[in-house]
Amino acid sequence: MFKHLQFSATAAVSLLLVLNPLLATAKDGSVTFDMVVSGGARACLPNATGHVTITPAGPVEIMDVVVEGLPPNTEFDFFVIQVPKAPFGVSWYQGDIETNAHGRGHERFVGRFSIETFAVAPGSAPAPVVFNNGPFPDASLNPPFNPIQMYHLGLWFGSPQAAQAAGCPGNVTPFNGDHNAGIQVLNTSNFPDDFGPLRQVHP
């Protein structure tokens, strides 16, 4: 029975790799894959693309993100997320990506971006309330939860105004440092919700 289950799991992973040609694994263990345009940005940014390479480096991973086909000279916010589309689940702010005059941006992030990427809250504890004037104010207490694996990526406009300037919807979302970002632009919904690309990176 165990051998059968082990074989089935291996076959499932192999099938996933065959069916998703956007993911490639190199001899050095690095994994390369694409991000796709989010549903809310498909009409206004149909040519937006993202390309990600994650390279294991001992105790951490190095993640290089290249985005193109975006508005020029614009700031975007990059997150590791539980699922690629709404409601997104647990989300972890990584940093910003700024585009140049040609709508292209690149940033390198160093951290834990692999099958071991997770968040956990063993218990509730008071949290500082710093940003509390917007539509998504800080919570003053966290809910406890067991480990949640987070294997997807998402990119958001840094502000609703920037999104509207690009002809996109002006919805306000919490995905920036002040919790008043614009809509999601790119994500990894080309992978299953429970098998995001980070799951295929092994430290």
Please give the residue ranges for each predicted region.
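N-terminal leader/targeting pre-sequences
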Residues: 24-203
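Bacterial N-terminal signal peptides that target proteins for export
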Residues: 2-11
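Bacterial N-terminal signal peptides
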Residues: 10-20
